[in-house]
Amino acid sequence: VIFKGITFNEFKGKKDPDAVYKTMRISFENENGVYEETVFCPKEGDDVRQVSSNNGVERESPSNFEKFKFMLAHIGEQLAPKKYEAFKTKTFALPEEFEKLVKTFADITKDAVNKHTNLKLIANKKGEPCLPYFVNISKAGDAYISNNWLGDKVFFSDYEISQMNKQKSNGPTDMPGTSSDDFATSNDAATDNADLDFEV
């Protein structure tokens, strides 16, 4: 893929026109199309790790804030390693300085725009492309990148390959009493006042 850059965006909510959402958009493209990952400004509570229970075993998941930090780290280390070293020493108060953070990060990665790289995408439950889960919690309780999705060291696990093959083999569902003629076709083509520390 080709890295097309990072942009800051804001838009008003549909349900609540008074609500303004601030996002960071990361763009890639190749001959098959465009992929954009949209990350929302961290909000209060995003630094809390969720705990789920399965068969009596509790499992802690990385917080949204940790995922955001490690996303920036992964992009920075893969696309602008020298400039990222300086960037991660900076501190930004969130959510107030989210726009400043995004524009600063866009600036340190601008030399990588139009650079060819590898991007790992998987399918979500709807079959749409998305980034894989890439942050995990160690036994010691530390968050870490467990799944590279950008750069030269991008690989698919056996499980991910099996899921891709499953997606490819999924055909249309047969519906009794219907035929393809029954359907018309178309050919139209972080938390309040929290400081973001980038030591990861």
Residue ranges, per PLM feature:
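Short beta-rich binding modules
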Residues: 1-200
